[in-house]
C-alpha cells in the first residue's frame, strides 16, 4: 500500500507571477512536500499542541485559604436551625474562595519533530491539490513599499479572505507592503506551520521563500 501511495505522487508545476500581473516562468513543487496524503488526525494533534503551547497559563483563582477574612465562625454551631458553618469564606458564600478553580500551569505538549513536519506536508499538499498554492517573484516592484500595489497584486491572485504570505526575512519591502492588509498573515519559510497553513484560504510564496523551504526539507531547489 505504501508503495502504491508513493507511485501515485507526482510533482506539481505552478506559474510564477510578477507584480505587473504577467507570468514569469514556473516552479515545480516536489511531490514529497506538496503531494502527500493528508493525515487529518495527525494535523489535528499538531495544531492542538501548537495552540496549547501558545496559552499563557497565568490564570489563577483564590481558594478559601487564599481569601482574606472568614476566621471567625459566622454563628453558633447549634440552635439556629441553619446549616452549620465554620467560615464565611467557603465556596458557598458570596466573597468566598473558588473550589477547583484554575491555577497557573504549563499547557505545552511535547510533539516529535517528525510529526510536526509530516503534518505541515499534509497541510501544504491539501492546499496544492486544490490550487491554493501560488508563487510570485516579489510582492511589489522595486524597493519602495506600497500597500496599495501589494493589495492590487494579491487581488489578481486570489479573492479569498485569508491569505498566508511566505517571504524571506530580508524582504522588508514586502513585509511593509502587506503587514497592514486585513486577512493577510506573513511568515518566513522557517516559521511555516500547520496551523497557519490550514487557517489560510491561499498560501502565496515568493520564489526566494519557496526555494528556502524546499532546500531546508529536500535536496532540491526551484528556479523561476
UniProtKB/Swiss-Prot annotation:
Record's keyword annotation contains Ribonucleoprotein: yes
Keywords, comma-separated and alphabetical: Ribonucleoprotein, Ribosomal protein, RNA-binding, rRNA-binding
Gene3D superfamilies: 3.40.1370.10
Record keyword RNA-binding present: yes
GO MF assignments: rRNA binding; structural constituent of ribosome
InterPro entries: Ribosomal_uL4, Ribosomal_uL4-like, Ribosomal_uL4_dom_sf
GO terms under cellular component: ribonucleoprotein complex; ribosome
Region of interest called Disordered, as start-end residue ranges on this chain: 52-109
GO biological process: translation
Pfam families membership: Ribosomal_L4
Family the entry assigns: Belongs to the universal ribosomal protein uL4 family.
Function: One of the primary rRNA binding proteins, this protein initially binds near the 5'-end of the 23S rRNA. It is important during the early stages of 50S assembly. It makes multiple contacts with different domains of the 23S rRNA in the assembled 50S subunit and ribosome.
PANTHER family: 50S RIBOSOMAL PROTEIN L4, LARGE RIBOSOMAL SUBUNIT PROTEIN UL4M
Subunit note: Part of the 50S ribosomal subunit.
Name under which the protein is recorded: Large ribosomal subunit protein uL4
Taxonomic lineage: Bacteria, Bacillati, Actinomycetota, Actinomycetes, Mycobacteriales
